[in-house]
UniProtKB/Swiss-Prot annotation:
The chain crosses the membrane at residues 40-60, 97-117, 136-156, 201-221, 222-242. The gene is atpI. NCBIfam families: ATP_synt_6_or_A. It comes from Arabidopsis thaliana (Mouse-ear cress). It comes from the Eukaryota. SUPFAM superfamilies: F1F0 ATP synthase subunit A. CDD domains: ATP-synt_Fo_a_6. Belongs to the ATPase A chain family. The keyword Ion transport applies. It is found in: Plastid, Chloroplast thylakoid membrane. This is ATP synthase subunit a, chloroplastic. F-type ATPases have 2 components, CF(1) - the catalytic core - and CF(0) - the membrane proton channel. CF(1) has five subunits: alpha(3), beta(3), gamma(1), delta(1), epsilon(1). CF(0) has four main subunits: a, b, b' and c.
């Protein structure tokens, strides 16, 4: 009986170990300090960050009293982000505008880069480049940052009294309220990842089948949905932060 039990345990452990090593597609890795780093995501993320930083430098390099076209555009983007933050968070939205704005702009430019930048031209030893948000590692990281942000917002506003929300309106709902905090980052990450991955797959399939006319409307639709996904993510992040500060559901 002991031998059978040990065999089953060994089989389960080895099976789980093999499953944990399963990968979808081919990936390009860097070895840094004994760790495997997903290089594809880092490369494309650095490109997106460089675009954002370069645009910001150009926008604030020589501000004018009478705004130019470029300055007008960036002021419009800032006002838009402030409006989203104020609507979802409330009067204490000010300190959270940089965080919400960073989320929105990074996701927006990442999504659009998948449709506009010719990532496939760059050859890698393994795998291929794609939008940063086309990788589950990126979307989960963004969702976890959002989780840390709304926990910090609630704790900084209410202290340890923040945790009283888990037993409101009745202690019976404690497991459900705890589960809710785990499902928030999951829903954020998988929604963004699924939509961007599906959009790129549809374009790739249509280009391979009908390479001239049909993919163009789908690409324009992809640009639209990419912007909507960035707005949804930023809006929900702001709503979660506002909810944690107000303590309502």
């Amino acid at each position: 009986m002991n031998v059978l039990s040990c065999s089953i345990n060994t089989l389960i452990k080895e099976g789980l170990y093999e499953i944990s090593g399963v990968e979808v597609g081919q990936h390009f890795y860097w070895q840094i300090g004994g760790f495997q780093v997903h290089a594809q995501v880092l490369i494309t993320s650095w490109v997106v960050i460089a675009i954002l930083l370069g645009s910001a430098v150009l926008a604030i390099r020589n501000p004018q009293t009478i705004p130019t076209d470029g300055q007008n555009f960036f002021e419009f983007v800032l006002e838009f982000i402030r409006d989203v933050s104020k609507t979802q968070i409330g009067e204490e939205y000010g300190p959270w505008v940089p965080f919400i704005g960073t989320l929105f702009l990074f996701i927006f430019v990442s999504n659009w880069s998948g449709a506009l930048l010719p990532w496939k031209i760059i050859q890698l030893p393994q795998g291929e480049l794609a939008a940063p948000t086309n990788d589950i590692n990126t979307t989960v990281a963004l969702a976890l940052l959002t989780s840390v942000a709304y926990f910090y917002a609630g704790l900084s506003k209410k202290g340890l009294g923040y945790f009283s929300k888990y037993i409101q309106p009745t202690p019976i709902l404690l497991p459900i309220n705890i589960l809710e905090d785990f499902t928030k980052p999951l829903s954020l990450s998988f929604r963004l990842f699924g939509n961007i991955l599906a959009d790129e797959l549809v374009v790739v399939v249509l280009v391979s089948l009908v390479p001239l006319v049909v993919p163009i409307p789908v690409m324009f639709l992809g640009l639209f949905t990419s912007g909507i996904q960035a707005l949804i993510f930023a809006t929900l992040a702001a709503a979660y932060i506002g909810e944690s500060m107000e303590g309502h559901h």
